[in-house]
Amino acid sequence: MVSRVTLCSDYQECVNSFVQLIQSSKKELWYSTFLCNLKSPLPGHGQLTMSQLLQDASDRGVQIKVLYNPATSYGNLELKEACELFPKKNCAINVCTGSGKLKGFRKLMSPHSTYTYHHQKYIMVDKEWAMVTGCDVDGDRQPWLTLNSKNYYWLELGVVFNIRQQPLVQRFFEENWKHITPPPLPLINAHTEHSLVQWLIMNASSYIHLEQQLFISNDKTTNYVAKALVDRVVRAVRNQEQHFRCFVLTNVRNPDDSPLLDFFILMLLMWSWRWMELYAQEQGITLGAFYEHIVFLHLEHEGYPIKVHSNIVIQDGLRCVRSSSNLTDRSLGTLPCDTELGLVITDAAEIQRLQQTLWNRYLLQDPPQPVTPAEFFVRAWSNQGVLRNLMTHSLPNMFSVEYISFLMTMLHNEPFFGNRKKIRWTIKKVRR
């Protein structure tokens, strides 16, 4: 579907890729960002900042179009300050805002004034190359196993691909700057992405490797990814597919969120996980049989959490989706809260290279050696490398399905579950 794909396997590779793309631009540059601290030095590039990188492009005569998330919740500068750091010439800035606002007690449950965000991260250069995900900028985002100033690590992935023969993709990036536009394949989001992820899971023959910043999916959500995972494992048990494996990597701590929000995210993860166990048993298989095929993991190194921000689904080492979407109704429900964008990748050689890189990194295996799904499964269960099995994580006894279901139903609100009505997106030009 796309040719000449490069999968970046950590934030350093992502930074190197978007620096190279921007520095190579000759005519035009389109940049969409959820979080861009224009003053933050780019890792591996001395004191170079995104502000200077864009200024250099502007000085070369490159026409720059920025689609900016004006919310400051996660580290963006105030819009007025950000505009001072964007180039003054050859640079047009549009901001994207959603109609969702928090009111009443819901506002008390969140440190943010809004629950809708422009969350698409991409770069297009000269209608020849594009990068999807991995191109946000913030000091918390650091290369693999580089501790940031807040004492946690960061896991990031990105995709660079050639779009010279992709006129629909080129047109999407141009039109999306003016108004939020449904993406053409191989770009995906919302219902298309949700359906594809389910298809990848249900049609996997060897393994599913899933990494998600947030994992909120159960019988009360309108995304059915967790159900698809259980259904596929149940089928493996019934058909005696002893080789089939599912790897689910997510976060038990979200140190870039407030303590209150972090607590509720953990409860929702536990609710989803425990619901999957109950659903599997309802389908007639034991938990012992269930866990012969699936493992739930988080990442930790020397006592510090590794923030999973990679949001990728890999099927059998042959196909994958890398997306800005989280596994929640906010991104993949029937009424999404956030704008998202992902890419379908079918370059098997590149996917397998990435898969082996990730498995070797998680096992702290140096020099790298070939790792099979069966071997990774066994070593993941025994907490090798930076892998931590969720089954061995110390969690309060109160995290039962019944308790969390009752509590979250009582507190049912948009920041945690998703939206109850369709979001209207507005794009406005910033006048400077």
Indicate residue ranges for each PLM-predicted region:
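Gly/Ala-rich phosphate-binding loop of Rossmann-like dinucleotide-binding domains
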Residues: S58, V233, V237
